[in-house]
Regions:
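A short, N-terminal "cap"/entry segment at the start of jelly-roll beta-barrel domains
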Residues: 1-34
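Conserved short histidine dyad/triad with adjacent acidic residue
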Residues: 32-48
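Ligand-binding loop in jelly-roll beta-barrel domains
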Residues: 83-110
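Structural motif
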Residues: 32, 41, 60-62, 86, ...
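Short acidic-glycine-tyrosine-enriched beta hairpin
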Residues: 67-83
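A cytosolic small-molecule/anion-sensing beta-strand core signal
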Residues: 29, 57-58, 74-75, 93
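Glycine- and acidic-residue-biased ligand/ion/polar-headgroup-sensing regions
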Residues: 40, 49-62, 66-67
C-alpha cells in the first residue's frame, strides 16, 4: 500500500533561509509548488516557455509588468504571468508566496 504524505506547509516555510531563495514544497506531474519569501524587489526577467502562478500565502506583493499597470496582490490572491512577459515581483514587507510552475522552470529567472 502506498503511503500518501501529508505536507506541513508552515513547517516547510520555516526552512526558507532568506528572501528570494525558493524551496520546493512538492511535485505534481510535471509541476512544482515552490515557496519563497519576497522582500524588496527582484530583478526584471521573463520565462520564454512557461507560465508562472503566484499565490500570496501571507502578506502582500506587487508584480511590475513591462508596459502594463503594476499588479497588487493581497493575502489569498493569485495571478498567472504568461510566458514571455517581462516582470519584476517585489514586496515592502516580508511576504510568503507560493509559486506553481513547471518543474523545469529556473526559479532565478533568465
Amino acid at each position: 500500500m502506498t503511503m500518501i504524505p501529508v505536507i506541513d506547509l508552515e513547517e516547510k516555510i520555516r526552512t526558507i533561509e532568506k528572501p528570494w531563495s525558493p524551496i520546493d514544497i512538492t511535485y505534481i506531474n510535471d509541476q512544482v509548488i515552490r515557496a519563497a519569501i519576497f522582500h524588496g524587489d527582484y530583478h526584471w526577467h521573463k520565462h520564454d516557455d512557461e507560465d508562472e502562478l503566484f499565490l500570496v500565502h501571507r502578506g502582500a506583493i506587487r508584480i511590475q509588468v513591462k508596459g502594463e499597470d503594476t499588479i497588487e496582490l493581497a493575502e489569498g490572491q493569485l495571478c498567472v504571468i504568461p510566458k514571455g512577459v517581462e516582470h519584476r515581483p517585489g514586496s515592502d514587507e516580508p511576504s510568503v508566496v507560493l509559486m506553481f510552475e513547471p518543474s523545469a522552470l529556473k526559479s532565478t529567472g533568465d
